[in-house]
A protein has these predicted regions:
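Acidic, Mg2+-coordinating active-site environments of NTP-dependent enzymes
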Residues: 4-159, 234-236
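ATP-dependent carboxylate-amine ligase
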Residues: 65-67, 100, 110, 120-276
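Short glycine/proline-enriched loop/turn "hinge" motifs that connect secondary-structure elements
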Residues: 2-3, 206
């Protein structure tokens, strides 16, 4: 409450921090408080997210009546939407359709979520006073954050390091890369200790649904017994028809994937991002 925020963006919300909030509904309600800040002049909301209506209602109830701008990758009724979206391992391209006109955008950032975040950033910058025509010229020069869909090329294999540590984030990373893999799509991941235990088997199921082979490993156990974390990760999971390795030492798990991945394979190393 000590910040005089003028532009607020709602991108998305998925299961996380339930060890603190208790339920996803309570977590969403906490996020919605941002859009009631009376200092706000503009609110930018992703219509593609399932909680967007809650955020819209909060913004509309704001006595300061901030300007509400919406965006979407799929809905043409949004103020800003896109067409001709194409994904490549080198990034994405699309046509941005806005109140100011249509613009061709070439982004070097990999992944669906990066298209969403880029769109939100362009809208915020435009509202802050920059022309979209100028902004899109700088997009090809963007560099991704370390550990966020960070690509490491090795001969005919690809390794991707990402911070994904929720079921939804892991699904997004894997489905993005599945479009491009010609061999096997590997997932190396773990679950943090002293956090929401309920999402652990959901993480495993997400990996099994979208990758094969899968390596279960450690993330950051904090003060929790690592064995309990692995037990939770396997709770109620059917491992039939999947190649699954359980390697508790994260360094050894990564070494195993590097040693066994073949030409055409993509290996996702998820959970810790830039941390080493």
């Amino acid at each position: 409450n000590g910040c005089e925020i003028e532009i607020a963006v709602y991108s998305n919300l998925s299961r996380d921090h339930l060890d603190y909030h208790g339920t996803l509904e309570a977590y969403a309600a906490a996020k919605a408080l941002l859009f009631r800040f009376t200092s706000l002049k503009a609110v930018i909301i992703n219509l593609d997210d399932t909680h967007s209506s809650l955020m819209l209602d909060a913004a509309k109830a704001n006595p300061s009546q901030p300007k509400i701008l919406t965006y979407s990758l799929t809905q043409t009724n949004a103020d800003y939407h896109i067409a001709d979206l194409q994904y490549r391992l080198s990034g994405a391209s699309f046509t941005l359709i806005s109140p100011a006109g249509r613009y061709t955008v070439q982004s070097p950032l990999l992944g669906h979520f990066n298209v969403e975040n880029l769109l939100a950033s362009l809208i915020a910058a435009e509202y802050a006073g920059f022309a979209l025509a100028d902004l899109v010229q700088f997009v090809p020069q963007l560099k991704g954050a370390p550990g966020r869909m960070q690509v490491i090329q090795d001969a005919e294999r690809l390794f991707v390091v990402d911070y994904a540590h929720t079921p939804d984030a892991l699904i997004q990373v894997l489905t993005t890369l599945k479009r491009h893999v010609t061999g096997q799509l590997w997932a190396v991941f773990g679950c943090g200790g002293d956090r929401d235990r309920g999402k652990r088997p959901l993480m495993t199921q997400a990996a099994l649904d979208h990758a094969n082979p899968v390596i279960l490993t450690s993330d950051n156990p904090r003060t929790e017994n690592p064995e309990q974390i692995f037990t939770d990760m396997k709770q109620g999971i059917d491992f039939a028809d999947h190649i699954v390795h359980e390697i508790h030492d994260r360094r050894e798990a990564i070494k195993f994937a590097v040693a066994h991945a073949q030409a055409g394979d993509i290996v996702v190393i998820a959970g810790k991002g830039h941390e080493n």
